[in-house]
Amino acid sequence: LVDQNTRELVDEDIAWADFVLVSAMVIHREEVARLAERCHEQARPLIGGGPLFHAETDTPLGVDHVVVGEAEEVAADLVADMRRGRVRPRYEATRYPDLGLTPQPRWDLAHLEDYATMSVQSCRGCPFDCEFCDVVVLNGRKPRYKSPDQFVGELETLRDLGWRGPVFVVDDNFVGNRRRCRELLRAVIDWRARTGARMTFL
């Protein structure tokens, strides 16, 4: 796993892989095009996902395969096709996944020392339609939630990996459902009291 915001991608990283996967936002458009050139120079197929490919599904920027939508819905099919060596040009999620079934992020693959904050998420989707925001297009109008236990479990995993810095909650709308927000905050307060964790939340 290479985060090009914090580390340089070297040719050996590409040569090692059977497939190269990139998750990108719209601002990363030029970097993705350069990555595609590097992958093709080493005859490695590039699979793209993330908001960039939702916005530019007709212009894949040299990417060989595109995943549109939230990965939970298509990941199993994509991995099975990769194993068979028959990856389709396009995979598109047709519904929004149940976040209660979402596995924990693999923070153990990241270089935690490279980061000032770590990101966690307890919900996706938003009932509002603000003109400056594309959340409704990307993640839907109906909020979907992780359970308080699931969210606290992710915090516990970060703590077990040695993370003691700030945690950035990257929800689409953290306070949209006030009752659920209070339940989540109570669970976090109880966890902090039980474990002595002193994470700062942003």
Question: Each PLM stretch: what is its role?
Answer:
Residues P103-L202:
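Radical SAM [4Fe-4S] cluster-binding motif and immediate context
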